[in-house]
Swiss-Prot record:
It is a single-pass membrane protein. F(1)F(0) ATP synthase produces ATP from ADP in the presence of a proton or sodium gradient. F-type ATPases consist of two structural domains, F(1) containing the extramembraneous catalytic core and F(0) containing the membrane proton channel, linked together by a central stalk and a peripheral stalk. During catalysis, ATP synthesis in the catalytic domain of F(1) is coupled via a rotary mechanism of the central stalk subunits to proton translocation. The gene is atpF. This is ATP synthase subunit b. Its main location: membrane. InterPro entries: ATP_synth_B-like_membr_sf (IPR028987), ATP_synth_b/b'su_bac/chlpt (IPR002146), ATP_synth_F0_bsu_bac (IPR005864), ATP_synthase_B_chain (IPR050059). It comes from Marinobacter nauticus (strain ATCC 700491 / DSM 11845 / VT8) (Marinobacter aquaeolei).
Length: 156
């Protein structure tokens, strides 16, 4: 066996093997690698988009939370103001009612005072008439007259 012929035969076999690999084996492998590479690139871009979306969502949530806090603070402030107004209105109503009751009591006292004065006048007039009758019935004795006046004064 000649070594040169062996080398040429092996070279031809190797060339056929390379051609076979390039023609039939290499295209599916490169296609699979390209598909895998595309899939990885798509996954990375989706991860980047998701990361960006997450940041945007977090910013939006932070803004919404801040807005909700501000609205809650405004509502609490408004409720406190309304409560203060209600308390002030209640105080004013109570003060007016108290003044009204005081005025009614004063009017009642004045009315009772007038009635008592009228009753006292009537009683004094009755006593004066009774005293005058007793004085006129008895003799015009100075001693008896002074005793009657003392009794009349005691009754008043």
């Amino acid at each position: 066996m000649n070594i040169n012929l062996t080398l040429i035969g092996q070279s031809i076999a190797f060339a056929i093997f390379v051609w076979f690999c390039v023609k039939y084996v290499w295209p599916p492998i490169t296609a699979a690698m390209e598909a895998r590479q595309k899939k990885i690139a798509d996954g990375l871009s989706a991860a980047d988009r998701a990361s960006l979306d997450l940041e945007l969502a977090q910013e939006k949530a932070t803004k919404e939370l801040q807005k909700a806090k501000e609205e809650a603070a405004a509502l609490i402030d408004q409720a406190n103001k309304r409560a203060a107004q209600i308390v002030e209105a209640s105080k004013e109503d109570a003060r007016k009612e108290g003044e009204k009751l005081i005025e009614q009591a004063r009017a009642e006292i004045q009315q009772e005072r007038v009635q008592a004065r009228d009753a006292l006048r009537a009683e004094v007039a009755t006593l004066a008439v009774a005293g005058a009758e007793k004085i006129l019935e008895t003799s015009v004795d100075a001693k008896a007259h002074s005793e009657m006046l003392e009794k009349l004064a005691a009754e008043l």
